[in-house]
């Protein structure tokens, strides 16, 4: 999914509350994806106060939306550098095409992982039969040593595990007997946990990881701290478990990883290490793809998409700052 904000350099501050239980609550902000009929996502990362959770650098939560009347999701070919996109659906179906020749469907319970590395472009379109769209779009920042790898695409279907009465589908890393062999370049975990009403579970954690818990549905408390729907709870490294309770049927997404220990420059759909990196990526996208000068350049060509690629926004008038 592309970041379609008109001013992607501006990370609008939303409140972050540190509770007595050392659970930091990050509020979402609404971001429209495209025109007036387009769907709106709820973004909890990045924020001014927090840019990364391990390597996770971008969290969009959307739906459940009835997209039958709006035309659904239609994101034209757009570029990425220095990151991995992690697509995970709860409802609906999305058609993915990219410049390394991949054509795949994103379905509930199945992972689509695209590694941009030195550069890739892709499109995302909800399928004609999709009436409701509901899920998360996540990005992982690649470590500096790996950020220029050749681009590639993977599809995985995790086997379900369990924690007490809760079901677990771990799409990155491993947790509670569930996991995939998805290729990542720093230690990470990503899992969907579905809980029945009136239950409490103890989720095992990697002590060296920092973690985030996104609440999709339910009356959820984390270590006794209420976390509203679409909000993100942040937890520092040093924990070995996490107590999650809900009075109603609940779904959460657990994300974690070793602190990246690096600063990144993130603008629009690019991640680099300097202002100059991003300026160069934008110029190449505009020159190679939008102007049609070199369809076999850094970002390649998305075959099979009926439409034109997405132009990059104008760069801000100030230098882009590293965050981390």
List the predicted regions and their residue ranges:
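Jelly-roll (double-stranded beta-helix
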Residues: 1-324
């Amino acid at each position: 999914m592309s970041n379609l904000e008109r001013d992607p350099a501006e990370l609008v501050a939303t409140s972050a509350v540190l509770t007595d239980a050392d659970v930091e609550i990050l509020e979402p902000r609404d971001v429209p994806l495209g025109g007036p009929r387009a769907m709106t996502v709820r973004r909890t990362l990045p924020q001014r106060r927090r840019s990364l959770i391990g390597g996770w650098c971008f969290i969009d939560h959307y739906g459940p939306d009835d997209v039958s009347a709006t035309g659904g999701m239609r994101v034209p070919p757009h570029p990425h550098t220095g990151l991995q996109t992690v697509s995970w659906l709860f409802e609906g179906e999305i058609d993915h095409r990219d410049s390394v020749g991949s054509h795949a469907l994103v379905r509930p319970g199945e992972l689509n992982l695209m590694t941009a590395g030195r550069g890739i472009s892709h499109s995302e379109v909800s399928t004609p039969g999709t009436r409701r769209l509901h899920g998360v779009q996540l990005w992982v920042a690649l470590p500096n040593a790996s950020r220029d790898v050749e681009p590639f695409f993977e599809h995985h279907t995790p086997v379900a595990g369990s924690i007490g009465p809760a079901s677990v589908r771990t799409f990155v890393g491993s947790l509670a007997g569930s996991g995939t062999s998805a290729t990542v370049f720093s230690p990470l975990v990503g899992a969907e946990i579905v809980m029945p009403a009136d239950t409490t579970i103890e989720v095992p954690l990697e002590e060296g990881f920092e973690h985030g818990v996104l609440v999709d549905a339910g009356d959820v408390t984390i270590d006794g701290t209420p976390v509203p729907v679409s909000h993100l709870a942040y937890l520092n490294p040093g924990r070995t478990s996490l107590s999650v309770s809900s009075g109603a049927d609940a779904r959460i997404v657990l994300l974690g990883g070793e602190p990246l220990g690096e600063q990144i420059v993130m603008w629009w759909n690019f991640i680099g290490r300097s202002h100059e990196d991003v300026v160069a990526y934008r110029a190449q996208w505009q020159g190679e793809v939008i102007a049609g000068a070199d369809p076999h350049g850094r970002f390649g060509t998305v075959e099979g998409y009926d439409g034109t690629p997405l132009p990059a926004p104008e760069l801000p008038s100030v230098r882009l700052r590293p965050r981390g």
